[in-house]
Amino acid sequence: MRRDKKRSRKRVCSFCVDKIEQVDYKDVNRLRRYISERGKILPRRISGNCAHHQRQLTRAIKRARALALLPYTAE
């Protein structure tokens, strides 16, 4: 059996494109783009972020959740 792989274009890191050095935990609108409708952090292969910014993004989302800027779960 042969599997047909869907070839998609490589996504680029939006933080690198916008030349953002540090991911800010207070920028809630930007962070919401990287959270699923269930409240989970999107993985790198889906979000298209580089490893450096994905680690920063994860830390920023967790920090924003601890400060009640973002919900832990979906509403």
Swiss-Prot record:
A molecular function GO annotation: structural constituent of ribosome
SUPFAM superfamilies: Ribosomal protein S18
Matching HAMAP family: Ribosomal_bS18 (MF_00270)
GO biological process: translation
Keywords, in A-Z order: Ribonucleoprotein, Ribosomal protein, RNA-binding, rRNA-binding
Quaternary structure annotation from Swiss-Prot or TrEMBL: Part of the 30S ribosomal subunit. Forms a tight heterodimer with protein bS6.
Its job: Binds as a heterodimer with protein bS6 to the central domain of the 16S rRNA, where it helps stabilize the platform of the 30S subunit.
Gene, per the UniProt record: rpsR
Highest taxon of the lineage: Bacteria
Pfam families linked: Ribosomal_S18
Signal peptide per UniProt: none
Record protein name field: Small ribosomal subunit protein bS18
Cellular component aspect of the GO annotation: cytosolic small ribosomal subunit
Family that this chain belongs to: Belongs to the bacterial ribosomal protein bS18 family.
Sections of the chain in a coiled coil: none
